[in-house]
Amino acid sequence: SDAVADGEHAISGVVDS
């Protein structure tokens, strides 16, 4: 997680669906 306004995508390094 730790994504930014994109439905929690790979902004933290891992997809978090």
From Swiss-Prot:
Main location per UniProt?
secreted
Q: Which domain of life is it from?
A: Eukaryota
Keyword presence, Ribonucleoprotein: no
Is Secreted one of the keywords UniProt gives this record? yes
Transmembrane ranges, per UniProt, are none
What subcellular locations does the record give?
Answer: Secreted
What are the record keywords, sorted?
A: Secreted
Q: In what tissue types does this protein appear?
A: Expressed in skin granular glands.
Q: Which GO terms describe its cellular component?
A: extracellular region
Role summary:
May act as an antimicrobial peptide.
Q: Which family does it belong to?
A: Belongs to the Frog skin active peptide (FSAP) family. Septenin subfamily.
Q: What is this protein called?
A: Septenin 1
Q: Give the species.
A: Osteopilus septentrionalis (Cuban treefrog)
